[in-house]
Amino acid sequence: MALLQRASYLRLYYLRLMGSRPRLFSSSLSPALHRHSSTLSSPPFSSPSPSFRLKFQLTSVLSQRLIQRNAISSRFLSTEASQETTTSKGYSSEQIQVLEGLDPVRKRPGMYIGSTGSRGLHHLVYEILDNAIDEAQAGYASKVDVVLHADGSVSVVDNGRGIPTDLHPATKKSSLETVLTVLHAGGKFGGTSSGYSVSGGLHGVGLSVVNALSEALEVSVWRDGMEHKQNYSRGKPITTLTCRVLPLESKGTKGTSIRFWPDKEVFTTAIEFDHNTIAGRIRELAFLNPKVTISLKKEDDDPEKTQYSEYSFAGGLTEYVSWLNTDKNPIHDVLGFRREINGATVDVALQWCSDAYSDTMLGYANSIRTIDGGTHIEGVKASLTRTLNTLAKKSKTVKEKDISLSGEHVREGLTCIVSVKVPNPEFEGQTKTRLGNPEVRKIVDQSVQEYLTEFLELHPDILESIISKSLNAYKAALAAKRARELVRSKSVLKSSSLPGKLADCSSTDPEVSEIFIVEGDSAGGSAKQGRDRRFQAILPLRGKILNIERKDEAAMYKNEEIQNLILGLGLGVKGEDFKKENLRYHKIIILTDADVDGAHIRTLLLTFFFRYQRALFDAGCIYVGVPPLFKVERGKNAQYCYDDADLKKITSNFPANASYNIQRFKGLGEMMPEQLWETTMNPETRILKQLVVDDIAEANMTFSSLMGARVDVRKELIKNAATRINLQRLDI
């Protein structure tokens, strides 16, 4: 199903362990190459050998939700083991290093930006962008312009106050140079001396980290009718701070411009910023800050290919929820409110949809997405459960005294966004993935309770619809209880409780064990014969599994193939806390045919994993195997090709009068076990795509529109995707 290529919500990492001959790789998703560094360990039960590893990343346009190709690439990894030598090394004061200035950032960049791959590269943009948004949150900026330049640099310009340039009393440098070269120097530490009452920056490291990891950085500041400029390289100033008087017509100009070129010594993969990834973050910020207009421009050497977009959403979070629920059937209009309590601001927007069986809850703190939740999310959940139970009983909507709706029941079908702005946010780490302020939980809880109680008492029809939806979830949970208990009772890792078709591996260590989910008995037979039984298990599926996007929990647990997946993989029960150690295999590999049916089955499986146990993606357990499409035989030599480009490259090297044979593999069952092992299952020669969810909101939208019940939405998706199909690549 070619529509799988639309999975913009997934950041796909392609891993290839190669022998001596480099190849072009791709899959049905056909990404372009892009450098990305990684570490590599020897495959289980095999001796180490020199190898390459490729990581590829693929992201798509969020607005159209269509795939765009992202580049990525490889780095040679030494196989030398870093072991202690027999000679004891001395350990004295001579071995104690003192890193000064920005040296710690360059020494351990991952501590500050997460990684030196694509994610860390984009984090540099977010650091500068967040600074501009902090100016907007403070009420001093209304416009932010982001440009992805053709030379690989990025510039961010805002019309805020401009970074101060006067002499700093402590460092005896200009304030501009101070914030660019000194860690933990900034104006966002709170208190009466802070330059911001609310900000996403806390540690004073964002701008200096970007400077440290940039081959070159140019900064311009417009303040008080003056223009100040300075250039840096790898964290050090290479010019003095210059100053000139602005011409009369530009006297009122104010703001800051940062343009940086990421350092190739740090980002050893190809340095290429993805337009769609950055566009997604910008759209998010525009929803969160309705008074700001953010533009994004991607320059190209060909002017006709230059892209430009503006993002401005006056409706704020209410408009954000409407956008997320575009493909769903809402029960009511979006509910939204804003409260200010004890210096903190709480914004909440929420809406229930009749055709959704899970919730989407997004949390933000000072415009920073807290992907791991926090006290603001906890406050919303607790308040929703308590308030709706109270209102249901008060209104007599729930008549049975023994019924108590749980959080899962009341949140079924809910899309909720909560954004808090607090003077002193307590984030966990520099990456700010979770909010820890205990007082925020109480503020959010109280705000949600007051608003919902007042609104729903005035609108009993909406209350009745929400409670009805929750009661249906409650009844479905009761109907599924027996099946859930069956799953629990069979979850013990005994062969007698495992699916009959599962060909297990001999290893009982989940870290080295992997399972291939294959399509049908034919492919299952070849895979069982071709695998390495020591660490590779095979689970054949019978036809297409249930589309759980359109089914409730009771129907899901009754499905035999779903039960086999849950029991065979050790997934546990939906809704319970995910524990990776309970999995039977830490690599779950989807291996289907390279045709429409194979893509459909792959999509159904991804839907199941996302809805049933989303944490599998976060834990890095979900992979997609890529079998070859062609086998090229010339004489006694045979080569495998994974796409048309690979095929073209190989055949173009043959003489014009060469005689060779091309075999097209329609399915895995056509391959001999030895071929399947060599091309698709051998850890040293295979291609795997590792899937992780990079944007939960976008992922939810994609699954809803692609696999949901609304035909009109799916039809529109197909029409949009059709315009991007390369007709030359269709197998007709």
From Swiss-Prot:
Catalysed reactions listed for this entry: ATP-dependent breakage, passage and rejoining of double-stranded DNA
Classification via PROSITE patterns: TOPOISOMERASE_II, TOPRIM
Keywords: ATP-binding, DNA-binding, Isomerase, Magnesium, Metal-binding, Mitochondrion, Nucleotide-binding, Topoisomerase, Transit peptide
Positions bound to Mg(2+) 1: 519, 593
Enzyme class: isomerase
Keyword ATP-binding found: yes
Positions bound to Mg(2+) 2: 593, 595
Gene Ontology cellular component list: chromosome; mitochondrion
Keyword Kinase: no
SMART domains: HATPase_c (SM00387), TOP2c (SM00433)
Alphabetized GO MF terms: ATP binding; DNA binding; DNA topoisomerase type II (double strand cut, ATP-hydrolyzing) activity; metal ion binding
Listed EC numbers: 5.6.2.2
BP term (GO), one: DNA topological change
Function: A type II topoisomerase that negatively supercoils closed circular double-stranded DNA in an ATP-dependent manner.
Quaternary structure note: Made up of two chains. The A chain is responsible for DNA breakage and rejoining; the B chain catalyzes ATP hydrolysis.
Sequence similarity: Belongs to the type II topoisomerase GyrB family.
Name of the protein: DNA gyrase subunit B, mitochondrial
Organism: Arabidopsis thaliana
Lineage per the UniProt record: Eukaryota, Viridiplantae, Streptophyta, Embryophyta, Tracheophyta
Gene giving rise to this polypeptide: GYRBM
